[in-house]
């Protein structure tokens, strides 16, 4: 009670007293603090019952006023006094002792405001960065500490200052041996009062405001980036700023944890190599990321509806305020799922912002400790429910990832790092890759669809290894083709408008009677270049109208139904194909792909051809399109159309060129569809009223007809509809790609 009255009286006296010069006023307030420790005998009274908070606030106001009255960069006498008399060192000692109780909180507030409100750079001064470093060590020591809020504010202002001047981070990398020796700055007596009694007020060695931090060899701190990078590799270092933030990420107070995560985000982005190495080699940052991912993943229910995993929203690591009571669409495990995906989002953003050295190390840690150690066994299990949930979670991760380094490690986890052509005996090299590809052909349609969607989203990611590993490495030598040297009479055939060696599909019995609605219009054909004698098949650019019409007339007329429904024509696919092709071209822009196929004379055509496990499964699935569920067919054709969009000449030739000379035993997408059509023509003859039933099913699928009695051969009819639409889509893709390549 009496201390509060004395505090009020003291403030009144200060307000009425004549103003002193700033330096005298500053020294007065500092001496008032030191005299408290000399004169008081009650060190258990809380600091809020003393004048110390008021004096500290006055000192800060004086420093700010002094800076405002001087030219930019000029150090005034009050700041000189603070630096030379080691005021911050003394305050650190008082804060560490927490004498009187609550002093640590006041010291943290003073440091935070000093660094935040003073514009001139303070951290280069030895008598600033050294006590700041010591105070950092006190932060995060105890979770749920009453000073947690002040601790995180202080740490974040230090991080912000380092973000402004990244080279300063070298002051905060301590040699472990030296850091242990330099612990506290308390005199042998051990009390805070003892240190103050030994402070004679005489200035020690002067450190100018613009002192070169690189010359402070006597401070025991690491020199700035001028120090050799090699030394950083041999000296074990402490990064206490990171360690304190890591401790505070575990705070039960969500706001504190988020602020700590923000501080780490600032630190990982610093461009200093030594800091990046220390971050990953001498701190537990990588372990924290993966351990929390693991614990959150293991907290998920064993079974979650894949649709819930796909559609859950509100995933943002900094906004985690989910309330079950307010969520009308809550499902079992939603809280745990959001927590897991939010932390993955944080890992992704952290790696995205990080220095490349730190990013690479953190991404590898996520792969080794979480993906391989935790997720892989879940993906390889035999329980269908477990496989479905694990695949859906992996699919969500693939969709969500944005950082280049983490994406690369996820790709290596799923596909492996091999780039040699595949063989049938390669299964043991990458068991997870093989198992996931097998799951595309799983007995469970749900697992097949989910795994196909995983690969579809994987193909849309900006990573060259994905497509090369799955497809391109097997097409590199073009040994799916059979080279036939042109005969002398080929020139005459070309001049007559035909292509040597090509099958004239328009004269094939399968393709006779093509209706006008299925042919390419004259406007679209106008983009095709004129046929020239130099235009051979082997250049991969067979005339676009022949290619397009080849796909459009694949399905016989009696198996077509789109022309009887408005708005389902071929032209509807052109717009989508054009948009998607531009997107894929943007993805592949930096991959340095060739503009033309590899010359036949440079290809090893004698090597045995294997299309690869991925294309094998897709082609096998495509071959069963008439006997598979509608949803499976949609997903299979979706993946194949995405593959066809890639602007690589070998992919275009293998998937979109009907006229390619296939080597014996090889198949292309077109040849697979031809076999399906042949089977379809036989089966049509056995189904009475096939065309009316087909039209009815199409209208039901489009919602133009209400559901009624079950139609016989429903799976076959739905498969025919998907087949027709897929052929139109491939025709549109072929046209768009050719038009793009022929446009100057």
Swiss-Prot record:
Protein species of origin: Xenopus laevis
Organism lineage string = Eukaryota, Metazoa, Chordata, Craniata, Vertebrata
Q: Which Pfam families match?
A: DUF5917, KELAA, RAI16-like
Q: Where is this region: Disordered?
A: 197-229
Q: Which InterPro entries match?
A: FHIP, FHIP_C, FHIP_KELAA_motif
Q: Give a short account of what the protein does.
A: May be required for proper functioning of the nervous system.
Q: Which family does the entry's similarity section mention?
A: Belongs to the FHIP family.
| Highest taxon of source | Eukaryota
Protein name in UniProt: FHF complex subunit HOOK interacting protein 2A
Q: Signal sequence: where?
A: none
Which segments cross the bilayer? none
């Amino acid at each position: 009670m009496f201390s509060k009255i004395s505090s009020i009286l003291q403030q009144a006296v200060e307000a009425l007293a004549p103003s002193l010069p700033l330096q005298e006023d500053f020294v007065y307030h500092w001496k008032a603090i030191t005299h408290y420790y000399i004169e008081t005998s009650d060190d258990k009274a809380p600091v809020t019952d003393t004048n110390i908070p008021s004096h500290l606030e006055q000192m800060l106001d004086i420093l700010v006023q002094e800076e405002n009255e001087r030219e930019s960069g000029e150090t005034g006498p009050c700041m000189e006094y603070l630096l030379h008399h080691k005021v911050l060192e003394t305050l650190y000692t008082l804060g560490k002792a927490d004498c009187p109780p609550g002093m640590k909180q006041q010291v943290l507030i003073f440091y935070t405001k000093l660094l935040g409100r003073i514009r001139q750079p303070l951290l280069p001064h030895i008598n600033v960065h050294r006590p700041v470093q010591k105070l950092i060590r006190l932060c995060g020591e105890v979770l749920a500490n009453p000073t947690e809020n002040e601790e995180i504010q202080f740490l974040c202002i230090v991080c912000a200052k380092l973000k402004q001047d990244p080279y300063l981070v070298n002051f905060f990398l301590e040699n472990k041996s030296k850091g242990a020796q330099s612990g506290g700055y308390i005199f042998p007596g051990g009390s805070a009062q003892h240190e103050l009694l030994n402070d004679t007020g005489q200035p020690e060695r002067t450190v100018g405001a613009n002192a070169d931090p690189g010359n402070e060899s006597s401070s025991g701190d690491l020199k700035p980036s001028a120090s050799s990078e090699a030394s950083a590799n041999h000296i074990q270092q402490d990064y206490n700023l990171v360690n304190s933030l890591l401790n505070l990420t575990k705070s039960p107070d969500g706001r504190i944890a988020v602020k700590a995560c923000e501080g780490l985000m600032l630190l990982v982005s610093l461009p200093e190599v030594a800091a990046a190495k220390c971050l990953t080699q001498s701190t537990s940052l990588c372990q924290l990321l993966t351990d929390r991912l693991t614990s959150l993943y293991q907290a998920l229910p064993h079974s979650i509806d894949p649709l819930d995993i796909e559609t859950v929203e509100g995933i943002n690591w900094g906004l985690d305020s989910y309330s079950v009571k307010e969520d009308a669409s809550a499902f079992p495990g939603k809280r745990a799922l959001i927590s897991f995906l939010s932390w993955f989002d944080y890992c992704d953003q952290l790696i995205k912002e990080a220095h490349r050295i730190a990013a690479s190390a953190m991404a590898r840690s996520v792969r080794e400790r979480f993906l391989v150690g935790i997720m892989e066994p879940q993906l390889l299990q035999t329980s269908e429910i477990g496989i479905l949930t694990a695949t859906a979670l992996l699919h969500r991760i693939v969709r969500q990832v944005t950082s280049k380094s983490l994406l690369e490690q996820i790709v290596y986890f799923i596909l492996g790092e091999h780039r040699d052509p595949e063989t049938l005996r390669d299964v043991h090299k990458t068991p997870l890759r093989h198992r996931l590809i097998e799951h595309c052909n799983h007995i469970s349609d749900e697992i097949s669809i989910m795994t196909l969607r995983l690969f579809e989203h994987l193909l849309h990611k900006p990573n060259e290894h994905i497509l090369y590993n799955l497809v391109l490495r097997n097409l590199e030598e073009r040994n799916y083709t059979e080279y036939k040297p042109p005969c002398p009479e080929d020139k005459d055939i070309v001049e007559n408008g035909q292509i040597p060696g090509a099958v004239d599909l328009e004269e094939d019995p399968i393709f006779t009677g093509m209706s006008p609605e299925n042919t390419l219009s004259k406007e679209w054909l106008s983009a095709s270049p004129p046929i020239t004698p130099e235009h051979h098949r082997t250049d991969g650019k067979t005339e676009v109208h022949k290619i397009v019409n080849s796909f459009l007339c694949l399905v016989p007329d009696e198996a077509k139904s789109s022309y009887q429904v408005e708005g389902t024509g071929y032209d509807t696919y052109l717009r989508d194909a054009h948009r998607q092709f531009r997107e894929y071209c943007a993805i592949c822009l930096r991959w340095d792909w060739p503009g033309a196929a590899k010359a036949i004379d440079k290809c090893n055509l004698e090597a045995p051809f294997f299309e690869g496990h991925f294309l094998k499964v897709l082609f096998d699935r495509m071959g069963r399109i008439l006997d598979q569920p509608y949803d499976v067919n949609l997903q299979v054709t979706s993946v194949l159309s995405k593959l066809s969009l890639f602007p690589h000449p070998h992919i275009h030739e293998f998937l979109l060129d009907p006229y390619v000379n296939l080597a014996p035993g090889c198949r292309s997408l077109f040849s697979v569809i031809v076999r399906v059509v042949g089977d379809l023509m036989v089966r049509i003859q056995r189904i009475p009223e096939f065309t009316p039933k087909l039209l009815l099913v199409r209208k039901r699928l489009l919602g133009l007809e209400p559901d009624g009695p079950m139609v016989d051969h429903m799976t076959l009819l739905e498969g025919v509809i998907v087949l027709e639409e897929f052929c139109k889509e491939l025709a549109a893709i072929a046209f768009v790609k050719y038009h793009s390549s022929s446009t100057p």
